[in-house]
Amino acid sequence: MKIKDALIKAYSVLKETNDEFYMEDSQILLSYVLKKDRIFLITNREYEIEENSLKQYFDYINMRKKKMPIRYITEKCEFMGLDFHVEKGVLIPRPDTEILVEAVLEYIELNNYKKVCDVCTGSGAIGLSIAKYAKDVEVLCSDISPDAIRVSKINRQGLNLEDRVKIENGDLLEKPIERGEKFDIVVSNPPYIREDEIPKLMDDVKDYEPIIALVGGEDGLDFYRRITSMSKKVLKPGGLIAYEIGSDEANEVSNILENEGFVSIETRKDFARMDRVVLAVRGGL
């Protein structure tokens, strides 16, 4: 089968599922199978696809038909201009999370911060991106999920950051607290979706992405309360705490931080002009 015919067939399959990106998804998956870029598909529409590659392609199309996210099928995701390995068991990094990373990098440059802890690291996208772009910074990436630890270690190796990034399995900040370790920054994209919102999520999210990385308790704020309280034991005075938040959680998260003695609380918006990041500084001496 030629490229043009394979794409037409794939378009038809995915269009039936109301996938608004059916053409893009079909092209991404064929590019992945053929190990060619999408320009090749456009300029070589008469190219004959080998039988084994064709079978693999339509296996992937059927996975996408069942709403499996493209990033889980290809096990690849771009974040902050870097390539990350992702798979089922870890959350797929979102473009909006880049705003959190950029805010942290800004504070590092302004304050010469040297030590960062990324809590609920998942694939390691946040902590590893910070380490990649802030050359003098040491980062600890922590997660309770063994899958997250394994995947983040793959990404650490892929980005050649073994010398400055430590990855450990643990519950939030418990292990750093036990060691008496101190940080200039605690950053986290914790689970923040309310329990009653889970059934309303898109199928590709609720059916495939790990629930442990999504649910933030009855009101979505459980992890903000815990991390904020624990961070006072590891953050240096004047240190930064940086959160990704749900678009309706800015006031509640800001109140949690204020009640725990944090100051200079700031909210930043995402690409859709929705509240997405809250930053605060630990007060005291």
Swiss-Prot record:
Chain sites annotated for binding S-adenosyl-L-methionine: D143, N189
Positions of transmembrane segments: none
Binding site for substrate: N189, P190, P191, Y192
Enzyme class: transferase
Gene3D superfamilies associated with the record: DNA helicase RuvA subunit, C-terminal domain, Vaccinia Virus protein VP39
One Pfam family this sequence matches: MTS
Entry annotated with the keyword S-adenosyl-L-methionine: yes
EC number assigned by the record: 2.1.1.297
UniProt entry tagged with the keyword rRNA-binding: no
GO molecular function: nucleic acid binding; protein-(glutamine-N5) methyltransferase activity; protein-glutamine N-methyltransferase activity
Catalyzed reactions per annotation: L-glutaminyl-[peptide chain release factor] + S-adenosyl-L-methionine = N(5)-methyl-L-glutaminyl-[peptide chain release factor] + S-adenosyl-L-homocysteine + H(+)
GO biological process, one term: methylation
Record keywords, A-Z: Methyltransferase, S-adenosyl-L-methionine, Transferase
Protein family: Belongs to the protein N5-glutamine methyltransferase family. PrmC subfamily.
Role of this protein: Methylates the class 1 translation termination release factors RF1/PrfA and RF2/PrfB on the glutamine residue of the universally conserved GGQ motif.
PANTHER family: HEMK METHYLTRANSFERASE (PTHR18895), MTRF1L RELEASE FACTOR GLUTAMINE METHYLTRANSFERASE (PTHR18895:SF74)
Protein name, entry field: Release factor glutamine methyltransferase
Organism the protein comes from: Clostridium acetobutylicum (strain ATCC 824 / DSM 792 / JCM 1419 / IAM 19013 / LMG 5710 / NBRC 13948 / NRRL B-527 / VKM B-1787 / 2291 / W)
Organism taxonomic ancestry: Bacteria, Bacillati, Bacillota, Clostridia, Eubacteriales
